[in-house]
Amino acid sequence: VAIAAVLSGILSPVPEIIVIAHNIRSTHNVGAIFRTAEGFGISKIILSGYTPYPKLSGDTRLPHISEKLTSQIHKTALGAEEMVPFAYSEQIPLNSLKESGYRIVALEQNDRSINLADYTSPEKVALL
């Protein structure tokens, strides 16, 4: 208990982060998203639109399509697709994320962007 008290005094709370990957064409980019998400401790990935996704239980895609996409994603993800929880949705579930307390943050580089080092994350954030 004493160690936990000491650690809680020096460690900041880690935000719960969801990554939303919408309309990503390349299976290699999807694999890279999984691999990066695992390295950063991302809580979940939501794949949406025409983004390819690994095999899901109850997958309605033709088996050869599902297996081919899963294999291609695995080549880049290096197994991270089995470690990071994910879901697929045709539409981005923005309303349900907001209702669950997530702040939606769009990632884009422009003259109004905030440097990541200067950004203070809320407790629950969904990166789009």
Predicted segments with their positions:
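RNA substrate-binding interface of SAM-dependent RNA methyltransferases
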Residues: 4-110
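Charged helix-capping and loop-helix junction motifs
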Residues: 119-122
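Beta-strand/loop substructures that line and gate deep hydrophobic ligand-binding cavities in soluble
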Residues: 125
